[in-house]
C-alpha cells in the first residue's frame, strides 16, 4: 500500500518480530524512506533500506537501492551484491528523494516529450517513428510505452512528483499535459483498457493497431508516415553517428528537430538533478539504461554528442545545463567518462575530479580484452580471445550472431589452439543481444540462387564436423547462451560439455519455420538426450512417449521461454548451470571450464543413440496425419515432419537398435538437402527474410 501510515504500522510490527541482524527493506516507489522509519529504533534504522524494482521485474534489470542517512553502508553493499548475484539485477544507489532516480528523470522526459509533440502538431506515429531504436530507445518508443505502462500510472506518478518537488526549477514540465488528462477521463489508458494511443483490432484476419486522433479521440487506421530523415539517420551507422546527424539536421527538418528539442532538455535536466538524487553519473545513466531500456543514459549520450558542443547548443536554445557541467568544461575536461591506463573513469560533480567507475568483479568485458591485445584471431563474424588462465573464448559477432562460414572457420581455429599445452579449455560466448538467431539464411539463399547445392552440402558437413569436434575434443568446451539461442546457435550449445545459460535464454530448434530440419546435429541430439537415456536405464521401456516429445519439439518448433523450461525440454541437462545475471556469464563459464579441465575425460565414441525403427516412425507419421485431417498442419508441414520422424527413428531400420551419432547426422544432411530442393522451402525462407515471420504453406 503506497500510504505512509500503513507502512509505518507494518514497520513497527516487523521490528517486533524480525530476528537480530536481519536486513529490513521496503519496495516503495515514492514515499520517503526516512518518513517510513520514523519512530523506529536506531538499530532498526541501521538495517533499513529501500529497494525499488521496475516493472516488469523479470525483464527490467534496474534495482534502485535507497539508503537513509542511518543505513549501515555494509547493509547497502550486501543488498546490492544480493540483487546482482542472486536476482540478476543491476543495482544503483539513489538518494532518499521523491521518485528516486529513474522515475524522477523518466517522468520529466515523458511529460516534456508528450507536451512538445502536442504543442507542435506531431502525430503519434511520427513521434514513435523517430524515438525508438533509431535514437537508442526500445521499440515502444514514446506513446507505445505509455500504453504499456498505463496512462493512469504515468499521470499519477507525474502528479505525485509535481506535488513533492516544489523547489524543482522545471516543476511545470512535470505536470501532465491536458491531452493526457482528457484521455484518462475517457478511459483511454492503454493496453489495460484495450485502447490508448493505439487500439488493437482485427481486419481481414490480421491484427492491426489503429491510432488515436488527438482532436476527436477516435481511432483510425495507421498511416505509417514516411520519415525520410529517419532513414537517412539509420544509414549513418552507430548510435553516436545517428544522433549527431539528427541534431545537425534539426534546423531544417521537423522530425530531427523533435529529437533535438526533447533530447537536450532531458540531458540538461538530468545534470541539474545531480548531486540531488545521486552522487554519481553512472548510477543516473544505469537507471535509464536498466529501467527504461535506453542504449545509453543521459551522460553517456551527451558524451556521444560532444559535451562542449552540446552545452553551446543548449545555451543558444535557452536550455540551462548544471553549473558543475560548465565548471568541468572550464577546467579543461571535455567528457563525463574517459579511460586511463585501462580503467574507466567518471567525472564526479561532488569532488570535481575523475573517479573510477564501479566495476563488477564478475563481469568480463570482451571488448576490453580486445583493447588489451587479448584477441588471438578475428574475421568479420567471429573472434578468438584469451580469457586468461589457459581458457579461450570463441565470440560470435555476425549480424544476429547467425552461424556462417566464417564462424565455422574461427571455430576450427579454436580447435587448433586447444592443441596447445598451455590451453585448458574453451568458452563459446558473446555480449550481443542474442547468443545466436541460427543459421545465416542470406548466405544459404545466395548459394540457392546460384544453383550451388554442392556448396550448401559442404557447409552442412563443415558445421557438423566442427560441432562433433567440439563434442569429442580432449579439452572441455563450455557454451554461455543468453537471449535467443535458436537453430544452429542451439546446436552449438548441445555439443558442448557444459552449458552455463542466462536465466533469460530462449532455446529452440525452429528450422521447420523455413521448411527445413535441424542439420547441425540438433535432431540427433534430441534423440540422444530425450530418447536414449530411459532406454539405457531400462531396455524394455516403450520409446514412443520420449520420441513423441522430441518429435513435437522439433516439428512444432517449440521454443523454451526461459532457461528453466529449456531444462524441461532437455536442451539443458541437470549438470548445466543457470546464471541469473547475464553480465556474469563469461566469468561463470570460464570457471566451469577450469573446473572441468581438472582430470577431464572426453565422451567415448560409441553406438549411443537409440533408433526405434520403422514401427515407431509409422506411429509418429500417423500423428502428423491426424493433425493434417484436423487442419492443424498443412500438407508441406507433413512432408517436413516426416523427415523429422525418419531421422529420430533411424531411417529405414526394420528393428530397434543402438547406432553411432554419425549415423543420424548423415540422415540429417540428406533430409536437409532434399528439402532445400523444394519450392515450398524456398517460399518459407524468402518469407522469413522479407517479413521476419514464418510462413505456413
What do the PLM-derived regions correspond to, one by one?
Residues 490:
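Short glycine/serine-rich donor-binding loops of glycosyltransferases
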Residues 1-433, 442-462, 466-475, 482-486, ...:
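N-terminal glycine-rich phosphate-binding loop for ADP-containing cofactors
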Amino acid at each position: 500500500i503506497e500510504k505512509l501510515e500503513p507502512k509505518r504500522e507494518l514497520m513497527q510490527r516487523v521490528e517486533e518480530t524480525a530476528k537480530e541482524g536481519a536486513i529490513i527493506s521496503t519496495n516503495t516507489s515514492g514515499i520517503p524512506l526516512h518518513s517510513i522509519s520514523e519512530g523506529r529504533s536506531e538499530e532498526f534504522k541501521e538495517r533499513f533500506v529501500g529497494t525499488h524494482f521496475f516493472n516488469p521485474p523479470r525483464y527490467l534489470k534496474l534495482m534502485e537501492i535507497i539508503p537513509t542517512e542511518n543505513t549501515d553502508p555494509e547493509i547497502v553493499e550486501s543488498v546490492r551484491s544480493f540483487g546482482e548475484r542472486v536476482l540478476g539485477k543491476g543495482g544503483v544507489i539513489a538518494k532518499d528523494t521523491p521518485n528516486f532516480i529513474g522515475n524522477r528523470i523518466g517522468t520529466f522526459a515523458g511529460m516534456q516529450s508528450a507536451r512538445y509533440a502536442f504543442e507542435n502538431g506531431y502525430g503519434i506515429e511520427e513521434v514513435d517513428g523517430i524515438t525508438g531504436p533509431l535514437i537508442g530507445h526500445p521499440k515502444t518508443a514514446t506513446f507505445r510505452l505509455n500504453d504499456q505502462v498505463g496512462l493512469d500510472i504515468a499521470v499519477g506518478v507525474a502528479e505525485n512528483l509535481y506535488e513533492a518537488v516544489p523547489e524543482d526549477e522545471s516543476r511545470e514540465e512535470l505536470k501532465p499535459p491536458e491531452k493526457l488528462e482528457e484521455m484518462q477521463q475517457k478511459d483511454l489508458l492503454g493496453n489495460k483498457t484495450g485502447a490508448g494511443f493505439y487500439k488493437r483490432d482485427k481486419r481481414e484476419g490480421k491484427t492491426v493497431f489503429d491510432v488515436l486522433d488527438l482532436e476527436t479521440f477516435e481511432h483510425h487506421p495507421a498511416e505509417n508516415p514516411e520519415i525520410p530523415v529517419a532513414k537517412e539517420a539509420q544509414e549513418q551507422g552507430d548510435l553516436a553517428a545517428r544522433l549527431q546527424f539528427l541534431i545537425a539536421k534539426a534546423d531544417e527538418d521537423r522530425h530531427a528537430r523533435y529529437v533535438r528539442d526533447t533530447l537536450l532538455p532531458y540531458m540538461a535536466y538530468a545534470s541539474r538533478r545531480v548531486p540531488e538524487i545521486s552522487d554519481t553519473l553512472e548510477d543516473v545513466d544505469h537507471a535509464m539504461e536498466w529501467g527504461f531500456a535506453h542504449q545509453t543514459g543521459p551522460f553517456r549520450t551527451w558524451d556521444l554528442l560532444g559535451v562542449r558542443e552540446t552545452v553551446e547548443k543548449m545555451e543558444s536554445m535557452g536550455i540551462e545545463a548544471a553549473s558543475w557541467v560548465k565548471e568541468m568544461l572550464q577546467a579543461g575536461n571535455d567528457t563525463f567518462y574517459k579511460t586511463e591506463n585501462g580503467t574507466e573513469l567518471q567525472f564526479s560533480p561532488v569532488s570535481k575530479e575523475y573517479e573510477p567507475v564501479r566495476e563488477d568483479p564478475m563481469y568480463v568485458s570482451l571488448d576490453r580484452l580486445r583493447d588489451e591485445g587479448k584477441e588471438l584471431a578475428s574475421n568479420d563474424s567471429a573472434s578468438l580471445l584469451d580469457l586468461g588462465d589457459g581458457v579461450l573464448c570463441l565470440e560470435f559477432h555476425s549480424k544476429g550472431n547467425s552461424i556462417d562460414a566464417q564462424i565455422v572457420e574461427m571455430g576450427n581455429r579454436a580447435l587448433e589452439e586447444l592443441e596447445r599445452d598451455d590451453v585448458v579449455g574453451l568458452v563459446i560466448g558473446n555480449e550481443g543481444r542474442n547468443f545466436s538467431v541460427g543459421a545465416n539464411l542470406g548466405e544459404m539463399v545466395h548459394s540457392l540462387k546460384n544453383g550451388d547445392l554442392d556448396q550448401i552440402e559442404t557447409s552442412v558437413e563443415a558445421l557438423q564436423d566442427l560441432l562433433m569436434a567440439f563434442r569429442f575434443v580432449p579439452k572441455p568446451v563450455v557454451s554461455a547462451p543468453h537471449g535467443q539461442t535458436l537453430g544452429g546457435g542451439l546446436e552449438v550449445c548441445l555439443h558442448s560439455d557444459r552449458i552455463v545459460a542466462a536465466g533469460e535464454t530462449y532455446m529452440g530448434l525452429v528450422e521447420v519455420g523455413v521448411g527445413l530440419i535441424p542439420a547441425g546435429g540438433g535432431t540427433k541430439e534430441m534423440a540422444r538426450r530425450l530418447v536414449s537415456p530411459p532406454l539405457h536405464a531400462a531396455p524394455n521401456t516403450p520409446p514412443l512417449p520420449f520420441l513423441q516429445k522430441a518429435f513435437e519439439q522439433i516439428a512444432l518448433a517449440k521454443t523454451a521461454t526461459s532457461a528453466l523450461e529449456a531444462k524441461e525440454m532437455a536442451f539443458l541437462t541437470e549438470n548445466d548451470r543457470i546464471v541469473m545475471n547475464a553480465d556474469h556469464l563469461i566469468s561463470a563459464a570460464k570457471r566451469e571450464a577450469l573446473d572441468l579441465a581438472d582430470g577431464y575425460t572426453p565422451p567415448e565414441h560409441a553406438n549411443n543413440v537409440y533408433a526405434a525403427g520403422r514401427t515407431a516412425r509409422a506411429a509418429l507419421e500417423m500423428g502428423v496425419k491426424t493433425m493434417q485431417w484436423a487442419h492443424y498442419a498443412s500438407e508441406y508441414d507433413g512432408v517436413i515432419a516426416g523427415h523429422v520422424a525418419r531421422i529420430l527413428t533411424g531411417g529405414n531400420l526394420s528393428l530397434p537398435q543402438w547406432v553411432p551419432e554419425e549415423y543420424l547426422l548423415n540422415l540429417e544432411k540428406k533430409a536437409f538437402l532434399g528439402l532445400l530442393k523444394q519450392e515450398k522451402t524456398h517460399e518459407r525462407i524468402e518469407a522469413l527474410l522479407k517479413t521476419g515471420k514464418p510462413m505456413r504453406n
